[in-house]
A protein has these predicted regions:
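Metal-dependent enolase-superfamily TIM-barrel catalytic cores that perform enediolate-based chemistry
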Residues: 94-148
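N-terminal hydrophobic targeting/anchoring segments and the immediately downstream early-domain regions
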Residues: 1-118, 174-215
Length: 215
């Protein structure tokens, strides 16, 4: 499909839904994400004549010149790092380029844009340490799914540009998952990027009639 679509590289996300936040559940989350990343790496190795893992833009260019597809790795939901900052370095060593801080519910890092109880009023104290460590490790901070307050907290704290990997425009479609004009402008000034999410309800409030023209 990548060949047919003339796509040279993709980000593959090790996704984990939000679960319980007791110690046992957090350890299980870390193990699940570790397994997903190992699975991506294994598939790349099994098909090394066709693709490879990319961590840098130089890796991407090398793979393209070799006629291979590039697989970048991300983690969707910081729940997957548990409460141990050392896991950030561990995942960096496994090739992770970005981590989405939360998903559809609040976690130990920050408040979500959906189903939120505004537990932290934005970024938590632990979340501040997570962002600092991600900056130190060279992992992009992804604020898709996070609450607007979480976004502002992170963009002020981060020493590196942040991203919103799959968020659309609030001005075009009112949904808590989308970004306001103020957020988009701040993101541009920060040197970061936002990628449009094509989920029907994020691009058309009458989502049952959404189409690609809405994007």
């Amino acid at each position: 499909k990548m060949q047919e679509g003339k796509l040279d590289g993709v980000f593959l996300a090790a996704f984990i839904g939000q679960g319980k936040r007791d110690e046992a559940s957090l350890q299980e989350a870390v193990q699940k994400v570790t397994g997903l990343i190992e699975g991506i790496r294994k598939q790349a190795e099994l098909n090394k004549d066709l693709c490879g893992i990319a961590v840098t833009n130089q890796d991407f260019i090398r793979l393209k010149n070799e006629g291979k597809k590039a697989f970048f790795i991300g983690i969707e939901n910081g729940y997957g790092i548990g409460k141990d900052l050392a896991n950030i370095a561990k995942f960096k060593a496994m090739g992770v380029n970005y981590i989405t801080l939360c998903h559809s519910y609040d976690n130990d890092i920050c408040d979500s844009s959906t189903h939120t109880k505004k537990e932290w009023d934005g970024l938590s104290p632990f979340g501040e340490e997570v962002v600092k460590e991600m900056n130190r490790q060279g992992i992009m901070v992804d604020m898709s799914h996070a609450s607007e307050k979480s976004f502002w907290d992170v963009i002020k704290l981060s020493k590196a540009p942040i991203i919103c990997s799959h968020s659309s425009s609030m001005a075009m479609c009112k949904h808590d998952r989308n970004l306001t004009d103020e957020q988009l402008k701040a993101l541009a000034q920060n040197g970061g990027v936002a990628q449009v999410c094509l989920l029907d309800r994020y691009i058309n409030e009458d989502y049952k009639n959404a189409s690609l023209t809405d994007a």
